[in-house]
Structures are given as C-alpha cells and as structure tokens.
C-alpha cells in the first residue's frame, strides 16, 4: 500500500514527510533527493511554494502546460476525472487542496493567443479577463471533501464553452503568457450535465 502511494503521489508525500521529520527551527530545506531529472525542478518548485511565506512564483510556460492543459485520454465527463488528474499533476497550494481548478483540452499556443483577445468581465471580483473566440472543451473541478493533501476530493463537471483567462508579462520570453483560468462559460445551447442516472447528456 505504501509503495503504491509513493508511486502515485511522490511529490506531496515527500513534502509531508519532510515537514514531519525536520525540527521547527530548521530554516534550510534539503532538496537533494534521488529524483529523475524531469521531476527535480518540479519538486524544488513544490518545496519553495510549500515553505514560502511570500508571493508565489510568476507563471512559466512549462508550469501552465503541466497544471492546466490535458491530452485526449480519459473521457472528460468521467465522474473521477478531477480526482485522477489533480493527483497525477500534483495540483496543490502549499499543503492544502485548491478550492477549484480547470483543465483545458487545447494546445499551449492556442491558449497563449487568448492573452491578446479583448477584455471581458471575470468572476470572483477579478476586473479583466481575456476570452477565447471559440469554444473550448475542458473540466471544472470543485473541492467537496478535505482541505489538506493528499485527501482532496473533487466533483468533476465537463464543460464546452468560452474560456476566460488572466495573463501576466513574462520578462524572459518578452510576451504575455497565461496565468490563471478564471472560468469556462458555456453558452445556453451547450449546457451539459449528468442526469440522475449518472448519464452524460447535452441539452438540445
């Protein structure tokens, strides 16, 4: 059982283990773990975010691709889509579950172009978002149980609509890049839901 957990969720479990073992007054974080090269940078980012008391790192292209974009595979309307992908992609903030999250079925270049579209009102008090010109398929994840990793449980909602994003200037790339997904707004003719029998339907 423990081997299975470590294989599926290596980064969150390493963070929790380190927090339990180190003395409270210990200030420096040892990140010299025997991790594959493609996971080392990701783990160091989690360590910095986990112990930092300041603002989070600015977005990067690789971070956006890793956390927000998905490839065809598991059906987007699968009831456990969010639970599976959030664990697989290690979508957390410090040691807590995120309250909501979006996964988009699109390429990064398509998402990045939205940063140059016109501004529209956002939700949750955000003043300006950029809206996609076409409909985008994705999944909205809403936290339903627990608040600390790795016990996060989510309800999954398939959506096909206009994606609203915020963007930030990236100095190294000298261009705007996607920062957060604010919403995925379905037009009335594309409202989708699960029936009482758990069957995915699209209203006419």
Swiss-Prot record:
Quote any Pfam family the record assigns: RnaseA
In Gene Ontology terms, what is a biological process of this protein? defense response to Gram-positive bacterium
Q: Where are the transmembrane segments?
A: none
Q: Which domain of life is it from?
A: Eukaryota
| Carbohydrate attachment residues | 130, 142
| Keywords noted in UniProt | Disulfide bond, Glycoprotein, Secreted, Signal
- Which cysteine pairs are covalently linked by disulfides here? 97-152, 115-167, 122-129
Checking InterPro entries in the record gives: RNaseA, RNaseA-like_dom_sf, RNaseA_domain
Subcellular location field: Secreted
Role according to the record:
Does not exhibit any ribonuclease activity.
| Protein name, UniProt field | Inactive ribonuclease-like protein 9
Q: Which gene encodes it?
A: RNASE9
């Amino acid at each position: 059982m423990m081997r299975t957990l470590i294989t599926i969720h290596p980064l969150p479990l390493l963070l929790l283990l380190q927090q339990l073992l180190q003395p409270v007054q210990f200030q420096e974080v040892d990140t010299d773990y025997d991790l594959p090269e493609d996971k080392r940078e990701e783990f160091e980012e989690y360590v910095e975010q986990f112990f930092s008391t300041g603002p989070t790192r600015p977005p990067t292209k690789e971070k956006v691709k890793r956390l927000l974009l998905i490839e065809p595979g598991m059906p987007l309307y699968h009831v456990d889509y969010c639970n599976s992908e959030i664990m697989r992609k290690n979508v957390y903030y410090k040691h807590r579950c995120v309250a909501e999250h979006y996964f988009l079925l699109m390429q990064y270049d398509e998402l990045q172009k939205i940063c140059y579209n016109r501004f529209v009102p956002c939700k949750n008090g955000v003043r300006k978002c950029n809206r996609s010109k076409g409909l985008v398929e994705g999944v909205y994840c809403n936290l339903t149980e627990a608040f600390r990793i790795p016990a996060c449980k989510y309800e999954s909602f398939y959506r096909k609509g206009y994606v609203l994003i915020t963007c930030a200037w990236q100095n190294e790339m000298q261009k705007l890049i996607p920062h957060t997904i604010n919403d995925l707004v379905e037009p009335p003719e594309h409202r989708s839901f699960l029936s009482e029998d758990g069957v995915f339907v699209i209203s006419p």
